[in-house]
Amino acid sequence: MAKSIPRTGSRRNVRSGSRKSTRRIPKGVIHVQASFNNTIVTVTDVRGRVISWSSAGTCGFNGTRRGTPFAAQTAAGNAIRTVVDQGMQRAEVMIKGPGLGRDAALRAIRRSGILLSFVRDVTPMPHNGCRPPKKRRV
């Protein structure tokens, strides 16, 4: 069987520059999604394009530790560190979900030095929509 010769300039071998452009972003939106199992922090510009994101799982927390307030604080710090370097000074915060990491993530955002124009709770609440699942019996 003949050996396959790797082509120079193929997509897998050559990578031209960094994928993320380092634009100057003065204002952005920080989305915090806090579930009982994990906390995901996404930073976007005002048009909704994702600049940076982090979660408790990507920060190295496994299992039930992902739902802790400390994990949420670490995830928020990681997501915001990159956008502060890109020059973000002001931000709006949208918090979604009932998780333990809500307050801890907000505390980490406040401590980062970004001025918050407002904090909004965007947790979806049904107007008596679908029937909820039956109660757990343990």
Curated annotation (Swiss-Prot):
Main location, first listed in the record: plastid
Keywords: Chloroplast, Plastid, Ribonucleoprotein, Ribosomal protein, RNA-binding, rRNA-binding
One GO process term, biological-process aspect: translation
Keyword Plastid in annotation: yes
Keyword Ribosomal protein: yes
A molecular function GO annotation: structural constituent of ribosome
InterPro entries: Ribosomal_uS11, Ribosomal_uS11_bac-type, Ribosomal_uS11_CS, Ribosomal_uS11_sf
Locations listed in the record: Plastid, Chloroplast
Disulfide bonds: none
Signal peptide extent: none
GO cellular component entries: chloroplast; ribonucleoprotein complex; ribosome
Region (Disordered): 1-25
Bias type Basic residues, positions: 9-25
Quaternary organization: Part of the 30S ribosomal subunit.
Family: Belongs to the universal ribosomal protein uS11 family.
Protein name stated in the entry: Small ribosomal subunit protein uS11c
Naturally occurring in which organism (per UniProt): Eucalyptus globulus subsp. globulus
